[in-house]
């Protein structure tokens, strides 16, 4: 009986370790990698939506989530209209460093994280 209980407990722990975690605040928003992700998100958005080209200023906030890689929810300050008008944008970026994968999951002017 004790062996069965330990086996079930071990199985539960392993299963929990494989599940995605909740979102947690990015500890150092000024980290060069985080700023690069924000710059990349703006560049990628400009590529798929060239009608309203944005200029990256900086990442101002965000959260991260461990999955099979990492999801990032970023609050990005950027300028539109040739740099005259700045605004806050939201981007969700998936990154898997070991496979060199990066995807822009969503991008929104009126983000609600």
Curated annotation (Swiss-Prot):
It comes from Oryza sativa subsp. japonica (Rice). It holds the Pfam family SQAPI. Residues 1-18 form the signal peptide. The lineage of its organism: Eukaryota, Viridiplantae, Streptophyta, Embryophyta, Tracheophyta. The record marks 22 as: Reactive site. The keyword Signal applies. This is Cysteine proteinase inhibitor 6. InterPro entries: Cystatin, Cystatin_dom, Cystatin_sf, Prot_inh_cystat_CS. One of its GO terms (cellular component) is extracellular region.
